[in-house]
Curated annotation (Swiss-Prot):
May form homodimer. May interact with host CEBPA, CFLAR, CREB1, DDB1, E4F1, HBXIP, HSPD1/HSP60, NFKBIA, POLR2E and SMAD4. Interacts with host SMC5-SMC6 complex and induces its degradation. Interacts with host TRPC4AP; leading to prevent ubiquitination of TRPC4AP. Interacts with host PLSCR1; this interaction promotes ubiquitination and degradation of HBx and impairs HBx-mediated cell proliferation. Pfam families: X. GO terms for molecular function: ubiquitin-like ligase-substrate adaptor activity. The gene is X. This is Protein X. Keywords: Activation of host NF-kappa-B by virus, Activator, Apoptosis, Host cytoplasm, Host G2/M cell cycle arrest by virus, Host mitochondrion, Host nucleus, Host-virus interaction, Modulation of host cell cycle by virus, Transcription, Transcription regulation. The lineage of its organism: Viruses, Riboviria, Pararnavirae, Artverviricota, Revtraviricetes.
Length: 154
């Protein structure tokens, strides 16, 4: 059973939330495209923007020169929605968003498959993934109709 993460736009804060898809979604396809995704600039990303990857549903920005702003992907491995690389992932994404790292598509795939997934499976920590909030991303990969409700309205 694969752990699924999805991003949802929080319009109140104009940010994307990266969060696990609820248990009720397991075993069913995530709504939304898994093929080529539309992009604001068709020249910014190749039409097959990484469709060969085993990680499905990566956002368009994952393959742009600016780097991924947030991620929604399906793991090919059996995992629960726990994270022990919770400090590494935001740092990598933030550096990519700032353009500080020129990760290729192959490097990006290797990071998830060999580093993040390995840490999840082997280190055995049980830190629950709540949400990653990464500002500035306008690639709206919403795979659930429900609004992002991680921020209490005060």
């Amino acid at each position: 059973m694969a752990a699924r993460l999805c991003c949802q736009l929080d319009p109140a804060r104009d940010v994307l939330c990266l969060r696990p898809v609820g248990a009720e979604s397991r075993g069913r396809p995530v709504s939304g495209p898994f093929g080529p995704l539309p992009s604001p600039s068709s020249s910014a990303v190749p039409a097959d923007h990484g469709a060969h990857l085993s990680l499905r549903g990566l956002p368009v920005c994952a393959f742009s020169s600016a780097g991924p702003c947030a991620l929604r992907f399906t793991s090919a491995r059996s995992m629960e929605t726990t994270v022990n690389a919770h400090q590494v992932l935001p740092k990598v994404l933030h550096k990519r968003t700032l353009g500080l790292s020129a990760m290729s598509t192959t490097d990006l795939e290797a990071y998830f498959k060999d580093c993040l997934f390995k840490d999840w499976e082997e280190l055995g920590e049980e830190i629950r993934l709540k949400v990653f909030v990464l500002g500035g991303c306008r690639h709206k990969l919403v795979c659930s109709p429900a609004p992002c409700n991680f921020f209490p309205s005060a």
